[in-house]
Amino acid sequence: MSSYQQKQTFTPPPQLQQQQVKQPSQPPPQEIFVPTTKEPCHSKVPQPGNTKIPEPGCTKVPEPGCTKVPEPGCTKVPEPGCTKVPEPGCTKVPEPGCTKVPEPGYTKVPEPGSIKVPDQGFIKFPEPGAIKVPEQGYTKVPVPGYTKLPEPCPSTVTPGPAQQKTKQK
């Protein structure tokens, strides 16, 4: 019986050594672990006690067309402070008829001399003081659960003589 135990304890070490020898060639599939692959073989990771090495056909590495990675220009990330997501119940939406839209004479368009267009192609927007925004007292907080947004009024700024002067220089 003791000779049988010796054979049993003597046999596993060579198998473990084989596994250790083959492991350096195995890490690339293990490092590229893509959870989107739904193959049952992929989830089987060899355990320390398990000396069975998965077959080459069992471990599936996703092909270039399988995993979709958005292209650099495809994904749009909003600039900090640009997108504001309101918390539920905290959204302030004015009721229809309560929002005072500035009249044509009320909106202050920057003077022709206040807009500078640099030669590099960058557009300098008017400073906060140049455009007059209606104060907070004009809008009312709606009844909770009522979410109708007023239609935005596009403001058009036409380039004045300042741009023509810049082009002439």
Curated annotation (Swiss-Prot):
Please report what switches on or represses expression of this protein.
Answer: During squamous differentiation of epidermal keratinocytes.
Superkingdom of the source? Eukaryota
Region: 14 X 8 AA approximate tandem repeats, residue numbers: 43-154
A GO cellular-component term linked to this record:
perinuclear region of cytoplasm
* Primary location group: cytoplasm
Q: Name one GO molecular function term.
A: structural molecule activity
Which key words tag this protein in UniProt?
Acetylation, Cytoplasm, Keratinization, Repeat
Tell me a GO biological process for this protein. keratinization
Q: Which residues carry this modification: N-acetylserine?
A: 2
Location(s), subcellular: Cytoplasm
Q: Where are the sequence repeats?
A: 43-50, 51-58, 59-66, 67-74, 75-82, 83-90, 91-98, 99-106, 107-114, 115-122, 123-130, 131-138, 139-146, 147-154
State where composition is biased (Low complexity).
1-24
According to the record, the residues making up region (Disordered) are 1-57, 150-169
The biased composition feature labelled Polar residues covers 155-169
Described purpose of this protein according to its UniProt entry? Cross-linked envelope protein of keratinocytes.
Family classification: Belongs to the cornifin (SPRR) family.
Instruction: Write down what this protein is called.
Output: Small proline-rich protein 3
Lineage from the top down? Eukaryota, Metazoa, Chordata, Craniata, Vertebrata
Could you tell me the gene encoding this protein? Answer: SPRR3
